[in-house]
Structures are given as structure tokens and as C-alpha cells.
Amino acid sequence: RKCLNTKTIALCAAFFLYCLLPLKGICQTGESTVDALVEMGFENVGWTEDGNERVYVLQNSAYRLQGVGIGKAVDVIQKMGLPEEKSCRIIVLDNNVPQISLYYHPIKGDSVLQAERDDWNVSYELGDTWKNARKIKLKNSSLFKIDVLVYPQLAFKNLVITQIYQVLFDLSPAIEVSLWKGMKLTAQLKIPVYNDGYGRFEDKVHPGHITISQRFRLPYNVFGKVTVGCFSADQYGVDAEFYRPFKDERFSLMARIGYTGMGYWSGFRYVYDPSTALVTWSLGGSFYWPQFNTQFNLKAEQYLLKEKGVK
């Protein structure tokens, strides 16, 4: 009887381990896909799944063009293997804030076994599994990473009758760092190389853009961004912008409001005038015509001199 019990236990254990083999294979596929994406340079990469759907989360930092980067990620996920008999979703982040998702649903009886890029549906909907996906631990986090960029800047104007152009050429190194989800700190330094007619302040090394921005996503697919700091065109203040695509994603609403004043850098000292602060705003809509890959915008706006217009 003891031998029978031992044999029964051994059979049960073997059956249990046999059942775990597919689960192990699924986990290895998901983890290996995440590792491959991280190796390519993607940030904030993770995955999860339930009985109906597998979800990958990623942020493109490897490719300058978002479309190219997302396409490369889709190719890798397809090559590593899609889940059998369940859908797959890719959620694309921007500074840890979800933007769009790509959704693939296998069709039963489809003679084509290999999925292609055209089989993925792109939308702003994140699906029900996002509630679980937002809790997973992401690999290759973008937080606290410092990006160093160098921008050559060329400006010219034609205001003097005796001179064709007045020219300003700067080198502008900048750093960007994110300290929490959706946040970005940008600090720029302007180093004058050639200045002909742009004034004595542009002869000095001085800061350029210094801003803190916060991106967020509200319910009903409302995207927002708030920025505080020193902007271009000798402006400082706060600016908020919002974007809301409709269910028919060819149509969308756009809104922006800012409260800014005039200021300038004298070396590393910032000179500003609070009495110049005023409200600017913009409200409009957009239509995308996919047949001709063309977008039309119509906006009513108030500008820096309090003039209003439509464009």
C-alpha cells in the first residue's frame, strides 16, 4: 500500500510538472521578447497577460522617428512569437504616459500563419488589461537618465536697407531628464559663435530654454501637458495644452492656454517685467484625410499683442 501511495504521488507530481511546461514556455517567450526589445534600446519595457490577451508595454528611444521605432518593435514581437488563440496588444508610452495601442486578434481558420504589420489595429484605446499592465515592473526605465543634446541654431533677418541679412549662429547644448512619470526637465545653454546685428545680449553665453513639463492622460482619452519656465521669443510663464481625439479618430479637438510675460537673459541673470504678463489661448479642431495622408487644422487664437485671429 505504501508503494501504491508513492507511485500515485509521483504520477500526480509528473502530471503537475507537465501542465507547467506550457506556462514556462509562455513566460520565456514574453521575457525573451522584453529582453530583445531592451537590447535594441527601447525603454520602459514590460509584459503581462491574462486568459484573453497578452500586453507589451514599451517606449521608443532607439529610433528618431516614432513610426520607424514602433514598426521595428512590432517586427521583433512577431518574430519572437505571438500568443496562440489569444489577442496581443502593444501599448506605446511617451515619457511613461500611455499614448496609443496596437491590437492584434488572430482569426480562426486563417490560412496565413505569420502575422504582418498590416494586421495590427492602431487606436487610442488601451483595453481592459491596461489596469494590470500599469502595475508591472518595467525594464530599462527612462527615469533619472540624462540625455545630452547639441543643437546648432541659425537665425537671420532683413531689417537694414544697407545690409542684406543680419545673422546669428549659436551652439546650444541641452540636457533632458525625467524624475517621475510624465515629467521632463529641460535646460539649455546658448553659446554664441557668430553675431551680426542681434544685440549685445546675444554676444554672451547665456541659458536658453529652462522648463519643467508634465504630461498626463485623463479619462475619455484626453491628453494634456503643462509647462512652466523660460520659453523662446523672450517669454516666460506657464502654458497648458490639451488634445482629445474622437471615436472616429480622424477628428480631434485641440486647446491651449498660456499666461506669459516678457523677459530676457543678461548673461546668467534673468530680467523680466511682470506688467507684461497676459493670457494667450487657442481653440480648434483637426481632420485627418488618410487617403491623401493630409491633416487639416482650424483654430481661433489670441496672440501676444492681444490680437485675435483664425488660421
What name fits each language-model region?
Residues 1, 169-179, 205-218, 237-257, ...:
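Feature captures outer-membrane beta-barrel proteins of Gram-negative bacteria and organelles
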Residues 1, 57-60, 148-160, 185-192, ...:
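Transmembrane beta-strand segments that form the barrel wall of outer-membrane beta-barrel proteins
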Residues 2-12:
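Bacterial N-terminal signal peptides that target proteins for export
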Residues 12-24:
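Bacterial N-terminal signal peptides
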Residues 25-212, 272-274:
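Outer-membrane beta-barrel initiation region
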Residues 69, 167, 232-236, 302-308:
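Short, glycine/acidic-rich beta->alpha junctions
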Residues 134-147, 178-184, 217-223, 247-252, ...:
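Short loop/turn motifs that connect adjacent beta-strands in outer-membrane beta-barrel proteins
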Residues 193-204, 254-289, 294-311:
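Outer-membrane beta-barrel translocator/channel fold
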